[in-house]
Amino acid sequence: GKDVRLAKIINLYGCEIGDETKIGAFVEIQKNAFVGRRCKVSSHTFICEGVTIEDNVFIGHGVTFTNDSYPRVTTDGQLQTEADWKVEKTLVKKGASIGSGATILSKVTIGENAIVGAGSVVTKDVPANTIVAGNPARVLRTLAAGSWQRAAGSKRGNS
């Protein structure tokens, strides 16, 4: 894309990066991954094949995406070949924010304007306009009537 800013030490392999996106140092983005316009991908982040990141998304430092529920082992214990590999897609919708050190498992959609807390492990879909955190990540707050509301049963954070 146009006006993309890339740090000096990065690994990009057949991916697509939208206009005005910033990619930090020591980031790897694999083939068939897409990062939208006006995104920021912070240092030490791994974006694997099959990940789509829409526009205006923030990715914190050291975020890891996965793309296979059973990586590199077949049912008989052998290493998979490229032909055995089954890429499971992940989608991060526009305006989402993922905190540093989060791990996003495969087959997950992170909704529009959702926020994933630092260090979270996202194992299932994150609804739009929610804040999730923890291992596994769970909903802490939702955006309703223009302000963040504590989710039922949530004990974290201020009121």
Language-model features, listed with the residues they occupy:
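Flexible, glycine/small-residue-enriched loop-and-beta-strand segment within the central core
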Residues: 5-108, 136, 143-144, 148-150
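C-terminal/domain-terminus segments
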Residues: 109-125, 129-131
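Conserved switch/coupling elements of ABC/ABC-like ATPase nucleotide-binding domains
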Residues: 121, 136-139
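Intrinsic disorder/low-complexity segments
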Residues: 154-159
